[in-house]
Amino acid sequence: MAAGKFASLPRNMPVNHQFPLASSMDLLSSKSPLTEHRPDAYQDVSIHGTLPRKKKGPPPIRSCDDFSHMGTLPHSKSPQQNSPVTQDSIQESPWQDRHCETFTFRDPHLLDPTLEYVKFSKERHIMDRTPEKLKKELEEELLLSSEDLRSHAWYHGRIPRQVSENLVQRDGDFLVRDSLSSPGNFVLTCQWKNLAQHFKINRTVLRLSEAYSRVQYQFEMESFDSIPGLVRCYVGNRRPISQQSGAIIFQPINRTVPLRCLEERYGISPGQAREGSLTEGRPDVTKRLSLTMGGVQAREQNLPRGNLLRNKEKSGSQPACLDHMQDRRALSLKAHQSESYLPIGCKLPPQSSGVDTSPCPNSPVFRTGSEPALSPAVVRRVSSDARAGEALRGSDSQLCPKPPPKPCKVPFLKAPSSPSAWLNSEANYCELNPAFATGCGRGAKLPLCAQGSPTELLTAKQNGALGPRNSGINYLILDDDDRERPWEPAAAQTEKGQWDKGEFVAPLLETVSSFRPNDFKSKFLPPENKPLETAMLKRAKELFTNNDPKVIAQHILSMDCRVARILEVSEEMRRNMGVSSGLELITLPHGHQLRLDIIERHSTMAIGIAVYILGCTGTLEDRAATLSKVIQVAVELKDSMGDLYSFSALMKALEMPQITRLEKTWTALRHQYTQTAILYEKQLKPFSKILHEGRESTCVPPNNVSVPLLMPLVTLMERQAVTFEGTDMWEKNDQSCEIMLNHLATARLMAEATDSYRMNAERILAGFQPDEEMNEICKTEFQMRLLWGSKGAQVNQAERYEKFNQILTALSRKLEPPPVKQAEL
């Protein structure tokens, strides 16, 4: 760009001082007249690239002009000195001693008009775009997804702290920007009570498993999955950002240019966060170009690789735009005709007291030309100091990906443990006290804030110390040790032995089933019994046949409410569960044992009904009558009791392949109990299908349900692996994924409506007096002892179900043998 300005100039010519080139570039408004010099004292004009090379001798003494951050217009001028001053942009002052070839350090605050012109030309190229293009680019950003932070005009990206304070002028004004002191985090800047305030948005990483994690954002109270959601809540509800400040936001300050323009205008890239924060409090400090080693290293490290605009500007031997850095590790560059010599060694400046330094000798190795280095090392920055003795990358080599850094043989320069300077400017935020849940992590034992990574969190956890508050990222991890550690509910009890409801009590992790068949005392069963004893089967059949279907349904509902912990839940049981109902407990991780018990009762009841149909009948008419009685009980459970859990168990028994294959039995049912058969085909089967597809909300009034459908949820949560064998019918549907989401959504509603289910069950069972014998055969322990015996009831679930499935198949084939195929002739 700048080379085109000088293309018409010859290499050897005296420059006319009456029309200086600097004035044509509108860089300097006014300067003192130049001191008269001989024409032969001027050096040749260098047009190699865009930056002139430093000549021999001491640097000229110039006046220090402070420019704005744009680098185009002067802010203020210091008094001029009468020493020789360079005014032309490409003209060099003559040196009196031409034999001096020593490297000198340049003061970063001394301005070089030539270097300022390079930055001026770049920013003029950036900003000289038509408003229509900028408006179109801004509209494209605002049309992104609402969850994308860039789609909100109140997000201003990487703007300095001082600029954000100037944008908020009235109480309630706010904007969101990137944190320059903590890259990757965000800051909300607002004005309240005529004072600009900055609130760092706390970022929490929830690690649900080794492969999945979720990020949440919060100020003090509620956490959100996205920053737009957080802002919408605080703006819409006029909620104070913090209790201490009471700041309320309601008026967003919108940006008028794309984020790219803001980034290029203020010259702050993601890697420049900490360096940029040093000068944010001083807007009058010029961000000027510098050929210092520190500037090169900082720009090399912090230049974003994905910025195509900046990469495009670097071509040939033109170096990248080098911004000013605070550390003054400078090294002048030697110039020889058109070749550039880049020294690899560096010289460390004098360190402040208290810092242990080790001198690094200069390396005599140089790289010539503008070819990329063969093995350029990445310059790394540790704290506020840098390593020495690493190669300086060329301008063209920056276009290529950086290779992994080589080990540095120079010892690190460790700064004292006192707070850094940048903490006093950018990292000062208003105090927030996030309300993290201490129940799962037990508060002080598990640190919620860790700076850097989860590894530091675990280290802090072992040391028993909390991490620093200003890290901005919180990791919540629940490891195996925390899960397996026995809970201590007694710690939450008062001295009088009473539970304080205002204090959190860690729930009890149950590991033993509530069903204990061997400890069950029965009027019908001896202490030890064999599976399927004939006398016990006949007694159970008599009770089932002689009672009304509604009475049987009431006994089943009463027992279901106890097993699911809907009714008869004591205070101690609530304290151990951590919730008030078992319907909510089955949705929580520590409800594992209750889910297993629910699966056990459901499967045992279905198998018991199948045995009642197949093994307790003699003639075809008896089987048809038994089938009719089961259907009537299912109707009562559905309509009168609202017990969808046991209703699904009875329907599972009726739809077993060992039952559906009994064609003669179903034919006799249609002939002798026609109304019951029609009721089963037209109402019960379609309703069961709707339930298992997650569409019960469309056909079941909520005020009529006492026990909801539980099996799809507990089956999904307890299934160890995805298998195609043993899956339910709804899982083989083409819409199985949508059905699964319906069941999960229903589970959330079920956990919220536990009080409604409890009141419905109490209303339905009001005045119910259970029969002792009928109540006993409805218990799960009795059914387990009856089906598997006293010894078989202790065997694994899967093994018991598999063997009994074979028994049912044998009974079904005995009652109605399969048709014999004719022998092939």
Curated annotation (Swiss-Prot):
- Please indicate which residues carry the site annotation Required for interaction with NEDD9: 748
Per UniProt, the keywords (alphabetical) are: Acetylation, Cell junction, Cytoplasm, Guanine-nucleotide releasing factor, Methylation, Phosphoprotein, SH2 domain
Q: Name one GO biological process term.
A: positive regulation of cell population proliferation
What would you give as a GO molecular function for this chain, any one?
Answer: phosphotyrosine residue binding
**Compositional bias of type Polar residues: which residue ranges?**
75-93
Q: Which Gene3D superfamilies match?
A: Ras guanine-nucleotide exchange factors catalytic domain, SH2 domain
One annotated Gene Ontology cellular component of this protein: focal adhesion
Q: Which residues form the signal peptide?
A: none
Residues covered by the Ras-GEF domain? 548-818
The superkingdom of the source organism is: Eukaryota
Residues with the modification N6-methyllysine, per the entry, are 334
Annotated spans, Disordered: 31-93
Where do the segments described as Mediates the interaction with BCAR1/p130CAS lie? 744-748
N-acetylalanine-modified residues are where?
2
Q: How does it assemble?
A: Part of a complex comprised of PTPRA, BCAR1, BCAR3 (via SH2 domain) and SRC; the formation of the complex is dependent on integrin mediated-tyrosine phosphorylation of PTPRA. Within the complex, interacts (via SH2 domain) with PTPRA (when phosphorylated on 'Tyr-798'). Interacts (via Ras-GEF domain) with BCAR1. Interacts (via Ras-GEF domain) with NEDD9. Interacts with PTK2/FAK1. Interacts with PTPN1. Interacts (via SH2 domain) with EGFR (when tyrosine-phosphorylated).
Function, please? Acts as an adapter protein downstream of several growth factor receptors to promote cell proliferation, migration, and redistribution of actin fibers. Specifically involved in INS/insulin signaling pathway by mediating MAPK1/ERK2-MAPK3/ERK1 activation and DNA synthesis. Promotes insulin-mediated membrane ruffling. In response to vasoconstrictor peptide EDN1, involved in the activation of RAP1 downstream of PTK2B via interaction with phosphorylated BCAR1.
What protein does this entry describe?
A: Breast cancer anti-estrogen resistance protein 3 homolog
The organism encoding this protein is Macaca fascicularis (Crab-eating macaque)
Q: What is the lineage of its organism?
A: Eukaryota, Metazoa, Chordata, Craniata, Vertebrata
